[in-house]
C-alpha cells in the first residue's frame, strides 16, 4: 500500500497528498516533532491506570482523580504558553519537551510503593509540558505554509500525531506483556512440587 501511494503521488497530476507540503522545512520538522509528541503524550494515560488498578489495587474513582491531575496541568500549561508565545515559540517547544522528559523520567522511577501524590505530580508535569509544547509546535509547523494548503497539512499533521500514539502504545503494551511473562517464567522455574515452599499451602496460594 505504501509503494502504491508513493508511485501514485509521484506520477499523477492530482495526487492524494500534495508533495509541495514536504518542501516546507518548518512543516516537515513539525511532522517529525508531532509524531514524537504523539508517542510521549498518550501512552502514559493508557499504561498508568493499568498499573494502578491491577498491581496496586486502586479503585476506579481514585484512578480517575489521579488522571484528572494531568488535565489540570494542561489547563495551567495553556495559560503559561499564552505568555511564552508572545516572546518566541521555540522557547515553548523546548520547555514543553523538557517538562515531558522530566515527567517521563519521574514515572520511570515508579514502583509498587509509589505515593498517589507522586502519580498526580507526574501527571501535572506532563500535562503542563504537553500544553506548552503543543501550541508553539502547531504555530511553527504552519508558519510558512500557504493558506490554501492548510486543510491538507492539518490532516497530515494530526494523522501523524495519532499514528505515533498508536505505534508507541502498541509497543509499550507488547513490552509489558512480554517482560511480565518472562519474569513469571523465571520465578516459576524455582517452584515445583518438590521444593520446600510447597509444604506451606498459604504461600503456594500467594504464588
Predicted regions and their residues:
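12-transmembrane solute porter fold
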Residues: 13-182
Amino acid at each position: 500500500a505504501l509503494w502504491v501511494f508513493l508511485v501514485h503521488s509521484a506520477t499523477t497530476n492530482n495526487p492524494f497528498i500534495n508533495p509541495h507540503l514536504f518542501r516546507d522545512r518548518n512543516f516537515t520538522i513539525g511532522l517529525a516533532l508531532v509524531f514524537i509528541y504523539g508517542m510521549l503524550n498518550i501512552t502514559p494515560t493508557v499504561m498508568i491506570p493499568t498499573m494502578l488498578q491491577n498491581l496496586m489495587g486502586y479503585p476506579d474513582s481514585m484512578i480517575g482523580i489521579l488522571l484528572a491531575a494531568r488535565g489540570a496541568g494542561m489547563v495551567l500549561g495553556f495559560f503559561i504558553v499564552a505568555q511564552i508565545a508572545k516572546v518566541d515559540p521555540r522557547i515553548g517547544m523546548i520547555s514543553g519537551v523538557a517538562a515531558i522528559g522530566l515527567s517521563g523520567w519521574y514515572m520511570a522511577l515508579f514502583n509498587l510503593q509509589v505515593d498517589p501524590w507522586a502519580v498526580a505530580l507526574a501527571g501535572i508535569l506532563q500535562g503542563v509540558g504537553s500544553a506548552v509544547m503543543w501550541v508553539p509546535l502547531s504555530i511553527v509547523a504552519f508558519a510558512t505554509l500557504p493558506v490554501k494548503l492548510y486543510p491538507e497539512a492539518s490532516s497530515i499533521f494530526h494523522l501523524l500525531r495519532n499514528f505515533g500514539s498508536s505505534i508507541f502504545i502498541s509497543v509499550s503494551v507488547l513490552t509489558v506483556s512480554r517482560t511480565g511473562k518472562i519474569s513469571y517464567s523465571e520465578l516459576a522455574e524455582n517452584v515445583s512440587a518438590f521444593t520446600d515452599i510447597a509444604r506451606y499451602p498459604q504461600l503456594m496460594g500467594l504464588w
